[in-house]
UniProtKB/Swiss-Prot annotation:
Its EC number is 4.2.1.109. Pathway: Amino-acid biosynthesis; L-methionine biosynthesis via salvage pathway; L-methionine from S-methyl-5-thio-alpha-D-ribose 1-phosphate: step 2/6. Signal peptide: none annotated. It catalyses: 5-(methylsulfanyl)-D-ribulose 1-phosphate = 5-methylsulfanyl-2,3-dioxopentyl phosphate + H2O. It is an enzyme of class 4 (lyase). The keyword DNA-binding does not apply. Binds 1 zinc ion per subunit. Belongs to the aldolase class II family. MtnB subfamily. GO terms for molecular function: methylthioribulose 1-phosphate dehydratase activity; zinc ion binding. This is Methylthioribulose-1-phosphate dehydratase. It comes from the Bacteria. The gene is mtnB. It comes from Leptospira borgpetersenii serovar Hardjo-bovis (strain JB197). The keyword Lyase applies.
Length: 250
């Protein structure tokens, strides 16, 4: 698919996500990367996602993180990159087979509370072992699946650095991460797969909120160790709890 077609596809998705309430106001951003190229296209800052067009995307050099002047001659005048551009870059730098990134601010992802902090910036949230996990290619019966939750640093670059380090060290089982009190970033090999993954992710988080299916119902902190986890589950980060605001369920 050509760059033009992919940017048109992202523009359509932006309108859909805005309608779904996943990109309220000007929140969130969308990106594509043509595999083998030295950069990626990402939606600019301060744009309403229900009116995106191909001139609303900037080309960013993957290595430097800077705009590529020769690629941005036809973009909308005055368009600037969002600070969250670095989140997309982190995914592309860590995972070289990824061609699309979707960063949205869903309500459910903002209700998640874990034990992250500036000093412990990554936690693991156990996902429910439900059928929709097959969208991610997980076919094992009753799998133990965790998603990383990243601390919402005031400086977005710190979030990006943390995410990139995690993705490089631990091969992700699911194609998304949660940024606490912020939103989710979902990825895929192309726009079709990334969108499919986002729909599945939204369903899972809605399921968890609706059913109050806490990963640790006794409220005890459960830390994986060398003795109580399998090789695939072994991580150097904490397993998250999943408390939510009480008013959420009134």
């Amino acid at each position: 698919m050509s760059v033009k077609k992919q940017l048109e596809k992202l523009s359509i998705l932006g309108a859909t996500y805005h309608k779904n309430g996943w990109m309220p106001g000007t929140a969130g951003n969308l990106s594509v990367r043509i595999l083998g190229e030295s950069g990626f296209w990402v939606s600019g800052s301060g744009l309403d996602k229900n009116t995106l067009n191909k001139r609303n995307f900037l080309y960013v050099d993957l290595k430097s993180g800077r705009l590529s002047p020769s690629k941005n001659t036809k973009v909308e005048k005055g368009l600037k990159p969002s600070a969250e551009t670095s989140i997309h870059r982190a995914v592309y730098c860590a995972l070289d087979d990824i061609g699309c990134g979707l960063h949205v601010h869903t309500l459910e992802s903002n209700l998640i509370r874990t034990n992250t902090s500036q000093h412990r910036p990554v936690a693991l949230l156990e996902l429910p072992a439900i059928e929709i996990l097959k969208v991610y290619g997980i076919w094992k019966e009753s799998p133990k699946v965790y998603v990383p939750v990243i601390y919402n640093f005031p400086n977005v670059q710190d979030i990006s650095d943390c995410l990139e380090s995690y993705l490089k060290e631990y091969k992700p089982v699911v194609p998304f991460c949660i940024i606490e009190k912020h939103g989710i970033t979902v990825w895929g090999k192309d726009t079709v797969q990334a969108n499919r993954n986002l729909e599945a992710t939204d369903f899972i988080l809605k399921y968890m909120i609706s059913s109050r299916n806490l990963s640790n119902p006794e409220g005890k902190k459960n830390f994986p160790t060398e003795n109580n986890t399998s090789e695939s589950d072994r991580q150097k980060v904490y397993v998250a709890e999943f408390p939510v605001y009480p008013a959420t369920f009134l």
